[in-house]
Amino acid sequence: MNKKIGAIGEQLAVHYLKNKGYRILDCNYRTRLGEIDIIAILNDTIVFVEVKTRSSGAFGTPSEAVNYKKQMTIRRVSQQYLLSNRIGEDDWNLRFDVIEVQLIEKKYKINHMENAF
């Protein structure tokens, strides 16, 4: 996937989440283990979001790219985020979401899957 398309999708996802009342903590959080696209808070829940963007259906739906291996990577990176920011898991609910962004000409469609894994 083109990095530019991915960046556009992530920007649209951040805008979408803010409009839904989420507070964005971090974007593109990277460790040696991997990356989480968006980390946000909604009420008493820390939400780790994987954003998948497609400009065509040639590679299937965006969420199909979030396989078991990718899920485990996101879980490991989320643990690193919590540790490095001294956030206790007992203090917050944790959730793992996937946001699909489909770019169609000059329009887009967002599908937000809460508790995706």
Swiss-Prot record:
Q: Which positions, given as ranges, span the membrane? A: none
Supply the CDD domains for this chain.
PoNe_Nuclease
Q: Which Pfam families match?
A: UPF0102 (PF02021)
- Cite the GO molecular-function annotations of the record: nucleic acid binding
SUPFAM superfamilies, from UniProt?
Answer: Restriction endonuclease-like
Family statement: Belongs to the UPF0102 family.
Name of this protein: UPF0102 protein Clos_1471
Which source organism?
A: Alkaliphilus oremlandii (strain OhILAs) (Clostridium oremlandii (strain OhILAs))
